[in-house]
Design a protein with these regions (language model features):
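C-terminal lobe/lid and adjacent interdomain/linker elements of RecA-like ASCE P-loop ATPase modules
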Residues: 35, 91-174
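Walker B catalytic acidic pair
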Residues: 82-83
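GG-anchored amphipathic helix commonly corresponding to the ABC/SMC/Rad50 NBD signature/C-loop
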Residues: 37, 41-43, 57-79
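Conserved D-loop-proximal element of ABC-family nucleotide-binding domains
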Residues: 73-74, 86-94
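Amphipathic alpha-helical domain-onset/packing element
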Residues: 1-25
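Short flexible coil/turn linkers enriched for glycine and charged/polar residues
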Residues: 10-16, 28-33, 43-46, 58, ...
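Flexible glycine-/small-residue-rich
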Residues: 20-24, 39-43, 66-68, 130, ...
Length: 174
């Protein structure tokens, strides 16, 4: 609980509280315990089941915090996040990006994201492009060079000259 609280503070939860409840469950492929995460994002609000009270963006950040805590103990060399930054933006997205980049110092991290605040911190930036001929949809993936990366971040920011300047600034801040 302490480690989870510390990690979520980094992700923008200044006063969140957690309680982990471990209850016996029918033994199966996932073990013989059932873990429930009780959560409160704000002081004075009682702890309740995470899935009942947290927004989708809050759940994503809590899951990133859980993965971060577990990654320190696990010997798993690769972490894959598929839109772990969903439904967040602004300063929170910057914090999430920094946490993912921090994980990448000791693990191989593959992160699928639509947020320029997160993408800018990637060591390598890949673009997945879909195309269709009306019958089939195909996906292509390719690594972006520095110039293409600026263009892609600018596109993600909405396009235009201001977005291009913003993309260049974001990449310089890395």
């Amino acid at each position: 609980e302490k480690l989870l609280t510390e990690e979520t503070e980094k992700l923008g939860f200044a006063q969140a509280r957690f309680k982990l409840e471990i209850n016996p469950a029918e033994p199966g492929p996932n073990g013989a315990d059932k873990l429930q995460i009780l959560f409160s994002a704000n002081p004075g609000v009682p702890l309740k089941l995470l899935q009942d009270v947290a927004s989708s963006g809050e759940i994503c950040r809590v899951m990133l915090a859980v993965k971060t805590v577990l990654a320190e103990a696990d010997e798993i060399p690769v972490l894959i996040f598929d839109e772990i930054d969903a439904n967040i933006g602004g300063e929170t997205a910057m914090r999430v990006g920094a946490e993912i980049a921090s994980l990448g110092r000791n693990k191989q991290v593959i992160c699928i994201s639509h947020l320029p605040q997160v993408v800018r911190l990637a060591e390598r930036h890949f673009l997945v492009a879909k195309s269709t001929d009306g019958v089939e949809t195909r996906s292509r993936i390719g690594v972006l060079d520095d110039a293409q990366r600026v263009q892609e971040l600018a596109r993600m920011l909405g396009g235009g000259d201001a977005a291009l300047k913003h993309a260049e600034a974001l990449l310089k801040e890395r």
